[in-house]
């Protein structure tokens, strides 16, 4: 059985990406915040700052967070550095630079550094639009879906990004507390391209020299046994596996997943896809879960057996969720994935 994969992004403009489902996502890079492993107080304060910032994304509903082990491009940087060497010591300097590259690559294979990248789905602005304008736009969207189903595609407006600039600026202001920076069009292309060059040595300048969308996906993806993927590109090949995080501790206090990932001695990408959910849709599920927990507790009491800590903590967590829903607090549903690459 063969699967036809399509690249989801149709067009980009600066840090904005228009996807084929007509949603627009804005991308930002968040600088690392240096915190020592033992500084629990600073970790707690940073988590509060991040939580407060995330609440401001509620109206946008969808967002994703990626912790990316980016190729440090050591050899490329050393080449650039060699241009600054004095003429009378160039030979020695180049020898030392080459020695440094050889030692580090021999030990680490591909030296890397971690980048935090956040993507937020933007809302289209309709300020000043009349009812007639909104009705016309709704009809156009419906017509486009019909045309897409028949294999046709609407012509894209060259200024499609103008309708999203206001919301993008609002999001950028919300991220200012974390010193976020907008991705340039070049950076956005490179981050997209890196997904198909995982753990494959390459020169960034060479990758950026061919920036057509076709060049992003020129990697051949082969599905192997055991849940592995093999990436074959003009630059080399590597193996990738995607591991969904299936179980989290009930109590999140002291749980620093991003920190644990960075402690590993091999590159692992963390990707979190999240959505602010309609709390009205989970009330039925909460009620059924509460009934199930109550029956388990009553059965344990009637049989005079000790209840497992996991069941007790789950019941406490469910009560906490019901309280938050009752107080109309924002609830996020998310999935976390680890992407491991090797050669």
Give the positions of each predicted feature.
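Extended, folded cores of ATP/NTP-driven motor/assembly subunits in large transport
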Residues: 1-343
């Amino acid at each position: 059985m063969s699967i036809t994969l399509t690249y989801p992004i149709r067009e980009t403009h600066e840090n904005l990406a228009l996807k084929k489902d007509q949603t627009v996502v804005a991308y930002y890079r968040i600088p690392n915040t240096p915190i020592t492993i033992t500084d629990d107080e600073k970790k707690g304060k940073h988590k509060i700052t991040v939580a407060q910032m995330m609440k401001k994304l509620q109206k946008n509903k969808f967002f994703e967070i990626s912790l990316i082990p980016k190729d440090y491009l050591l050899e490329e940087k050393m080449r650039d550095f060699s241009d600054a060497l004095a003429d009378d010591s160039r030979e020695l300097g180049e020898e030392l630079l080459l020695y440094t590259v050889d030692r580090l690559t021999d030990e680490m294979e591909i030296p890397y550094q971690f980048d935090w990248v956040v993507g937020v789905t933007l809302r289209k602005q309709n300020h000043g639009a009349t009812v007639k304008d909104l009705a016309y736009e709704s009809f156009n969207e419906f017509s486009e879906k019909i045309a897409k189903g028949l294999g046709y595609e609407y012509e894209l407006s060259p200024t499609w990004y103008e309708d999203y600039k206001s919301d993008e600026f609002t999001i950028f202001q919300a991220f200012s507390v974390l010193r976020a920076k907008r991705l340039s069009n070049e950076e956005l292309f490179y981050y997209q391209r890196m997904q198909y060059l995982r753990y494959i040595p390459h020169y960034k300048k060479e990758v950026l020299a061919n920036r057509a969308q076709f060049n992003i996906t020129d990697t051949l993806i082969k599905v192997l046994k055991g849940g592995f993927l093999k990436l074959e590109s003009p630059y080399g090949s590597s193996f990738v596996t995607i591991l969904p995080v299936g179980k989290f501790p009930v109590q999140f206090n002291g749980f620093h997943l991003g920190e644990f990932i960075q402690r590993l001695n091999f590159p692992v990408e963390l990707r979190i896809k999240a959505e602010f959910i309609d709390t009205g849709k989970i009330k039925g599920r909460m009620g059924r879960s509460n009934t199930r927990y109550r029956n388990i507790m009553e059965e344990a009491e009637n049989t005079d057996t000790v209840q497992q800590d996991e069941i007790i903590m789950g019941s406490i967590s469910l009560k906490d969720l019901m309280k938050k829903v009752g107080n109309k607090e924002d609830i996020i549903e998310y999935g976390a994935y680890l992407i491991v690459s090797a050669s």
